[in-house]
């Protein structure tokens, strides 16, 4: 009986256990499991709303059916989630929509998602999912309409199994690491409308089977892919295609004429490829075209006559090709044309005279061609023209008076032509004007600046090398915002007006090669931001004003070839910022000072003044003070040499004895850990990390290892380069490390501890899982580093450097600022790293300690070449290079030809004008807020100014970066349409955006 009862009890336990195991996971438990798999920001609504006090149908992102029992939609986009995606999401059987876009979710995509048979919409874009695509999804998700995996870390070949999803209408696989060829079976989807494989590592030929997707409306295959050959002619079979983007993917050959069959196409982007031959006439058959960009190719021949049929065209970019011939007259008659950019070709003939008469023209850039004739008279008839660039042609005639009434105009660059006549008198009164470049022409007349209002945005006026004459009006003092005023090489006469002292933003003043007379206006010294002053080759007379010595940041002063008299002010010696002067060929007299800054100037700065005396200029006459030093006798010199020899021998003996004692001491000395916070590991744990497999970086300062401590904490261990015994502790090395260990700032990599045995030094830092900015930006994933993230990194790194320069005690100069020394944590937050070359500022604000070379190639400030000194402004220059990297996506050196770095390249491309940033912007970036990029580019140009004193401080950099100008929504929309022209843009802030990165037109 007992045995029977025991068996019965065991049977009941087994049945109970079976029911427990078989009990299905409820949808509530599935959601809670999903929540537990995420790492959630403390401010996330998931923490506040996802709790058991309310029904799960009311939780953030959860939508249920009418019965309020089953989840039908789960949208957790943009909630700053990290962690992994739990496979329990598969226990939401009626789920139709799953969107986790714009988070930081990692790990593989769970194959269990294939059990969600009702799923229609799956959006996992803008995360960090990795691994290969699970083929199980293709067999289970038979009702799937939308699959968006854009911008993840998925690898392997493009999944062929996806062709089983016959209901698919939208497929976005762009921005991953997919490799191999586009499968031929990708031409078999019966109802597909959107296909994007851009931004991967695809190779091979574009399969002709793509032409079978007759329902396709949008096709994106460019950016980072490297296809063989060109476009297949079958592309012409995509009769429903509206947008086609094949930019920057290595295409060659000619554009197939079959493309003319795409009668619904409104956007065609084929820029940055290697297309050759002539532009096919069949493009003119696509009357629906609105935006066409064929720039940065190798097209030859003329603009096709068939383009006259493109009546809807708003954007036409053909710049940087090898096109020639005349610009057809019909270009000027296109009724909708807003953007026309034909620069850097070989166009000849005249500009179509009707250009702009449609009243819609916004951007016109015809620079660097061989155009002749006159300027069209009505380019601004609609008062919408913002940018007018005809730089570097052979244009003649006068500047149309209508431009003086073009209130929308912001930039006018018509230098290096043969223009004559006078400058329109209203030009400088235009309210939005920021830049006027009319240099190297034959303009005559006076400077048309009246007492009326001028634009406060007018920052640059370049009228160099013309035939302008007359005196400068007093109203020149109304140019309150001008930073560069270049009037050299003209025939201006009269005195320099004292009102020039009101130009408080002026940094560069060039009045050389004119006929100015009278005394130098001492009011110039009130322009406290001036760094460059050139008044040479005029008829100026009188003394050099003593007030000039109060210009604290002046770098360059040229007063040569005038009629100046008197002595050179001795106080100029105290102008520490002054690095170049020229007083030659005047009537100056007296002794040239030999102290202070004068010790840096050579005799060529003073020649041509017969009454000057001093070094290199001959002895001073009677009555002129000069010091007389009796030369040393031969006996005294011999005694000095013998004394120095004896001291050297004594020093060598002492050094040998000291080295031996240090060696013996180090052999007996064990490893010693200096901790800068509470640590749960020892030096032995750190030493265990010093393995070849753990190396994550090598540099001049040493080797960096990734270390895992006993409790699982990750650290970065920097083993400093081997030094001679004890040398690492010379010059206050220990004190420096102690100081670094005390630094606590959100945007500076934290030094946790320091291990040393007097032979080897190990610095233990917090670990940054996303590596360096340089690795990310210049690696394949750089294209997925969105503008918002780039701006955030720039601002955070600036804040870190600002702390070192202004708030740290003692103040620190980094000395090696570069993108590889800006590290990114798991949230892509920036941290300034690597103080291996840093030295501490003294109270005087200058660095007295020098290393062999301060900085890395491409980042070194130009003044280092002749001063061999670094200070905060050297760091500012290097940071400016980092900003240019973020904007252009290019490395500092190696991409621009021998001897050309990124700063020189950017200057040549943009002429140092911030509004030309679109000519150098990273082609991998999606559409961006142009005013923000322009603002950051402006900051970069300030940082890389050649003269150190012209650069802002890091505190000013932070302030300027945070003060991005806001523009009204209407203007922002207008600006975006002006630049991208209905390009397939992706809104970075939108988690559901399905388009791949588009290319800014400039």
Swiss-Prot record:
GO terms for biological process: cell differentiation; floral organ development; gametophyte development; regulation of meristem growth; regulation of meristem structural organization. SUPFAM superfamilies: L domain-like, Protein kinase-like (PK-like), RNI-like. It is a single-pass type I membrane protein. Expressed in seedlings, roots, rosette leaves, stems, inflorescences, flowers and siliques. Residues 23-636 are extracellular. One of its GO terms (cellular component) is plasma membrane. It catalyses: L-seryl-[protein] + ATP = O-phospho-L-seryl-[protein] + ADP + H(+); L-threonyl-[protein] + ATP = O-phospho-L-threonyl-[protein] + ADP + H(+). Glycans are attached at residues 51, 80, 97, 123, 130, 153, 164, 212, 237, 312, 346, 420, 478, 558, 587, 602. PROSITE patterns: LRR, PROTEIN_KINASE_DOM, PROTEIN_KINASE_ST. Disruption phenotype: Rescues partially CLV3 disruption. When associated with BAM1 disruption, abnormal anthers at a very early stage and later lack of endothecium, middle and tapetum layers. Loss of stem cells at the shoot and flower meristems. The modification Phosphoserine is found at residue 851. The modification Phosphothreonine is found at residues 682, 867. It is found in: Cell membrane. Pfam families: LRR_1, LRR_14, LRRNT_2, PK_Tyr_Ser-Thr. Residues 969-1002 are annotated as: Disordered. The modification Phosphotyrosine is found at residues 765, 803, 859, 866. Residues 989-1002 have a biased composition (Low complexity). Its EC number is 2.7.11.1. One of its GO terms (molecular function) is protein serine/threonine kinase activity. ATP binds at residues 696-704, 718. Its main location: membrane. Residues 1-22 form the signal peptide. PANTHER family: LEUCINE RICH REPEAT FAMILY PROTEIN, EXPRESSED (PTHR48053), LEUCINE-RICH REPEAT RECEPTOR-LIKE SERINE_THREONINE-PROTEIN KINASE BAM2 (PTHR48053:SF131). Interacts with BAM1 and CLV1. Binds to the CLV3, CLE11, CLE18, CLE19, CLE22, CLE25, CLE26, CLE40, CLE41 and CLE42 mature peptides, probably via its extracellular leucine-rich repeat region. Belongs to the protein kinase superfamily. Ser/Thr protein kinase family. This is Leucine-rich repeat receptor-like serine/threonine-protein kinase BAM2. It comes from Arabidopsis thaliana. The gene is BAM2.
């Amino acid at each position: 009986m007992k045995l029977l009862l025991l068996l019965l009890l065991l049977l009941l336990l087994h049945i109970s256990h079976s029911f427990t195991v078989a009990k299905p996971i409820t949808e509530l438990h599935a959601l809670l499991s999903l929540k537990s798999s995420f790492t959630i920001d403390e401010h996330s609504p998931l923490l506040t709303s996802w709790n058991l006090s309310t029904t799960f149908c009311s939780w953030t992102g959860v939508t249920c059916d009418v019965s309020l029992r089953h989840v039908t939609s789960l949208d957790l986009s943009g909630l700053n989630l990290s962690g992994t995606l739990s496979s329990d999401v598969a226990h939401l059987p009626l789920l139709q929509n799953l969107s986790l876009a714009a988070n930081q979710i990692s790990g593989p995509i769970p194959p269990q998602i294939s059990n969600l048979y009702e799923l229609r919409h799956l959006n996992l874009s803008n995360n960090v999912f990795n691994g290969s695509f699970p083929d199980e999804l293709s067999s289970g998700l038979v009702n799937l309409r939308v699959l968006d995996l854009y911008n993840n870390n998925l690898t392997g070949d493009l999944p062929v199994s996806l062709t089983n999803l016959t209901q698919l209408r939208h497929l976005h696989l762009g921005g991953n690491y997919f490799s191999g060829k586009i499968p031929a079976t990708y031409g078999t989807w019966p109802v597909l409308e959107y296909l994007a494989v851009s931004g991967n590592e695809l190779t091979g030929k574009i399969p002709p089977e793509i032409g079978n997707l007759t329902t396709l409306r949008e096709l994106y295959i460019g950016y980072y892919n490297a296809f063989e050959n060109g476009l297949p002619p079958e592309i012409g079979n995509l009769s429903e295609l509206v947008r086609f983007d094949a930019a920057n993917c290595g295409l060659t050959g000619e554009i197939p004429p079959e493309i003319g069959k795409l009668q619904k196409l409104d956007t065609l982007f084929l820029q940055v490829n290697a297309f050759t031959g002539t532009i096919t006439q069949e493009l003119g058959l696509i009357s629906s075209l609105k935006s066409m960009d064929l720039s940065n190719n190798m097209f030859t021949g003329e603009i096709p006559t068939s383009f006259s049929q493109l009546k809807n065209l708003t954007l036409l970019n053909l710049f940087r090709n090898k096109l020639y011939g005349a610009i057809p007259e019909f270009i000027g008659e296109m009724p909708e044309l807003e953007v026309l950019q034909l620069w850097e070709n070989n166009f000849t003939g005249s500009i179509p005279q009707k250009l702009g008469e449609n009243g819609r023209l916004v951007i016109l850039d015809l620079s660097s061609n061989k155009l002749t004739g006159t300027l069209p008279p009505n380019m601004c008839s609609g008062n919408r023209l913002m940018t007018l660039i005809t730089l570097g042609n052979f244009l003649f005639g006068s500047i149309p008076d209508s431009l003086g009434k073009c209130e929308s105009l912001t930039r006018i660059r018509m230098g290096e032509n043969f223009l004559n006549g006078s400058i329109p008198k209203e030009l400088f009164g235009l309210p939005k004007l920021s830049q006027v470049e009319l240099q190297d022409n034959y303009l005559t007349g006076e400077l048309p600046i009246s007492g009326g209002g001028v634009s406060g945005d007018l920052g640059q006026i370049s009228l160099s090398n013309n035939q302008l004459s007359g005196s400068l009006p007093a109203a020149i003092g109304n140019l309150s915002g001008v930073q560069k005023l270049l009037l050299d090489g003209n025939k201006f006469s009269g005195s320099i007006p004292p009102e020039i002292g009101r130009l408080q933003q002026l940094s560069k003043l060039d009045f050389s090669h004119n006929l100015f007379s009278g005394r130098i206006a001492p009011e110039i010294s009130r322009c406290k931001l001036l760094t460059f002053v050139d008044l040479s080759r005029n008829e100026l007379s009188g003394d050099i004003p003593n007030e000039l010595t109060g210009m604290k940041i002046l770098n360059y002063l040229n007063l040569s070839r005038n009629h100046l008299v008197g002595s050179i002010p001795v106080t100029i010696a105290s102008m520490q910022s002054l690095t170049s002067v020229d007083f030659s060929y005047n009537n100056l007299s007296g002794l040239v000072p030999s102290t202070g800054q004068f010790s840096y100037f050579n005799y060529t700065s003073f020649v041509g003044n017969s009454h000057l005396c001093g070094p290199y200029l001959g002895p001073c006459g009677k009555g002129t003070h000069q010091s007389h030093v009796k030369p040393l006798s031969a006996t005294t010199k011999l005694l000095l040499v013998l004394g120095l020899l004896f001291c050297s021998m004594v020093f060598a003996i002492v050094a040998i004895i000291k080295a031996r004692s240090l060696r013996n001491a180090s052999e007996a000395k064990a490893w010693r850990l200096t901790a800068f916070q509470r640590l749960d590991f020892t030096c032995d744990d750190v030493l265990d990390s010093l393995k070849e497999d753990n190396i994550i970086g090598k540099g001049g300062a040493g080797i960096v290892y990734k270390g895992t401590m006993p409790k699982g904490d990750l650290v970065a261990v920097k083993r400093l380069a081997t030094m001679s015994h004890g040398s690492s502790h010379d010059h206050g090395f220990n004190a420096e490390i102690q100081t670094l260990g005390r630094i606590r700032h959100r945007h500076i990599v934290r030094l946790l501890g320091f291990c040393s045995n007097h032979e080897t030094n190990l610095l233990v830092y917090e670990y940054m899982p996303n590596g360096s900015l340089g690795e990310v930006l210049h690696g394949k994933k750089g294209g997925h580093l969105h503008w918002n993230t780039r701006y955030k990194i720039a601002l955070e790194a600036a804040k870190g450097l600002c702390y070192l320069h202004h708030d740290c005690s003692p103040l620190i100069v980094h000395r090696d600022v570069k993108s590889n020394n800006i590290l990114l944590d798991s949230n892509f937050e920036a941290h300034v790293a690597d103080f291996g070359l840093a030295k501490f500022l003294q109270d005087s604000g200058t660095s007295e300690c020098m290393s062999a070379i301060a900085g890395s190639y491409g980042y070194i400030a130009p003044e280092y070449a002749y001063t061999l000194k670094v200070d905060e402004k050297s760091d500012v220059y290097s940071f400016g290079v980092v900003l240019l990297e973020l904007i252009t996506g290019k490395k500092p050196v190696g991409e621009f030809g021998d001897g050309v770095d990124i700063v020189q390249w950017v200057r040549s491309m943009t002429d140092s004008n911030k509004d030309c940033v679109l000519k150098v912007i990273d082609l991998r970036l999606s559409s961006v807020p142009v005013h923000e990029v322009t603002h950051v580019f402006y900051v970069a140009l300030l940082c890389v100014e050649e003269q150190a004193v012209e650069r802002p401080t890091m505190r000013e950099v932070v302030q300027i970066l945070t003060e991005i100008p806001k523009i009204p929504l209407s203007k922002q929309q207008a600006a975006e349409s002006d630049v991208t022209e209905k390009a397939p843009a992706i809104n970075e802030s939108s988690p559901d955006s399905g388009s791949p990165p588009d290319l800014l037109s400039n």
